[in-house]
Structure formats: structure tokens, C-alpha cells
Curated annotation (Swiss-Prot):
Keywords: Acetylcholine receptor inhibiting toxin, Disulfide bond, Ion channel impairing toxin, Neurotoxin, Postsynaptic neurotoxin, Secreted, Signal, Toxin. Binds with high affinity to muscle nicotinic acetylcholine receptor (nAChR) and hinders acetylcholine binding to the receptor, thereby impairing neuromuscular transmission. Competes with the binding of alpha-bungarotoxin on muscle AChR (from Torpedo) with an IC(50) of 0.30 uM. Causes muscle paralysis, spasms and increased respiration. One of its GO terms (cellular component) is extracellular region. This is Short neurotoxin 3. GO terms for molecular function: acetylcholine receptor inhibitor activity; ion channel regulator activity; toxin activity. Disulfide bonds join 24-41, 34-59, 63-71, 72-77.
Length: 79
């Protein structure tokens, strides 16, 4: 009985994500699982040609500079 209980506990631990990991957008549709020390999703605009701007997205440890930065700390919040 103890062996069965121990086995169930081990399977549960292996299947669950016990350490919370943040997921952010890296591109328009691509996502990335952040490293444990990266606790912020960011988005900012990178100037491009002809007055256009390209959004840069990803994970970080702090809010980066740039044009119109958006920083947040929940999954997929940097759309």
C-alpha cells in the first residue's frame, strides 16, 4: 500500500509543473517559456524604414527601454 501511494505521489510530481514558468510571445504567433529568473514579458517598438515600427517581444528580468514599452507578468500578456 505504501509503495502504491509513493508511486502515485512521484507520478504526480513528475506530471505537474511545480515551479511556475512564465510564457510570453516572442513573435507574432510564436511563444517562448521564460527562464526561471525572467519574470517579465515585454513588448516595445523598434523603428524601421519609412516611419514603420516592428514590435519586439520576449521575456526579461526588467522592463526594457524603447518606444512605447509594455511590461507585464502574466502568461501571454505581451500580445
Amino acid at each position: 500500500m505504501k509503495t502504491l501511494l509513493l508511486t502515485l505521489v512521484m507520478v504526480t510530481i513528475m506530471c505537474l509543473d511545480l515551479g511556475y514558468t512564465l510564457t510570453c510571445y516572442k513573435g507574432y504567433h510564436d511563444t517562448v517559456v521564460c527562464k526561471p529568473h525572467e519574470t517579465i514579458c515585454y513588448r516595445y517598438l523598434v523603428p524601421a524604414t519609412h516611419g514603420n515600427a516592428i514590435p519586439a517581444r520576449g521575456c526579461g528580468t526588467s522592463c526594457p527601454g524603447g518606444n512605447h514599452p509594455v511590461c507585464c507578468s502574466t502568461d501571454l500578456c505581451n500580445k
